[in-house]
Amino acid sequence: AAAKAAGAEYCVLTTRHHDGFALWPSEYGDFSTKNYLDGRDLVGEYVEACRKNGIKVGFYYSPPDWRWNRERMSFSYGDTPPLGIDHESITLPEYTAEEQQRIDDEFNEYVRGQVTELLTRYGKIDIIWFDGRLPQKENTISADEIREYQPGILINPRGLGYGDFRTPECRFPEKTFAPEWWELCFVYSDGAWGYLNHECYKPNGWLLAELSKTRAWDGNFLPNVGPDGNGEMPHTYYQRMAEIADWMKHSGESVKGTKGGIWPERCNVPVTRNDSAWYIHIDWVCDDEITVTDVDKPKQLIYLRTGEEISFEYENRSIIFTFPENSKTILTDVVKVIW
């Protein structure tokens, strides 16, 4: 409910990460809620909560599985000698070609089985978000097969090497992917994708600035939050979501149902647009004079948070103004341009 109030249109749950633990009672493997938590289906509970709040359902799934391969892989980094799961020195086993093929086929069937469960147990699923290459790509499961189970589903490109949308991570791209669909995923807490025993989150001024830039380039923004061992979100998360919800009440129209297209070529700050207005996004650290070039003279500029009119100059087909210092907040301030 907190995410919905803050403007979330879809969520993506980590159904299984690289550690290999599946959050549903899977018939494949021995490391899921079938063997733990008395068979509780956490994925099903998530799906129910999404539908209750009118949020589209996304599943993250990691094809790589460190637990499955723990006796056959190194947990070291870079070019260092092989290390075991406890970072002890190990010698990796060697297999014949036939043995390796058997291992690969078993793992492939395991991944295929789990992905198929996710696609067939929970009704309509809107997004499948693979984090890593499927072990045998189309021979694991193809895009056509996925869509046979889930017509209309969106597939990210990390599993098959191609998909419906790009997924840059933790760094804003140097150039837009538009007209291709894309989504920027980012760590919202300060330090990790998973749960941390502190409540340090990036400020909402940062989050709204990233959202504004992403929407100005026709992308979606997917911030990550890790719950604790009981599935509870940290208190700070709810505070931040409430603050974003308040912002959405006055400025949500600037990021909902809008498109981009003119930043940075014709404006020095992000701009979103719809058929009736343009929206100029001024982030929490911007002190610059704002210039929008190659436009007709507007009727007025309105500060969405307060409704006050913003004075501006118009010359050489350019809008020029400075956002009032006494109106600035620590979030993104949005000025609506009306013609």
Predicted regions and their residues:
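Mature catalytic domains of secreted/periplasmic carbohydrate-active enzymes
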Residues: A1-W339
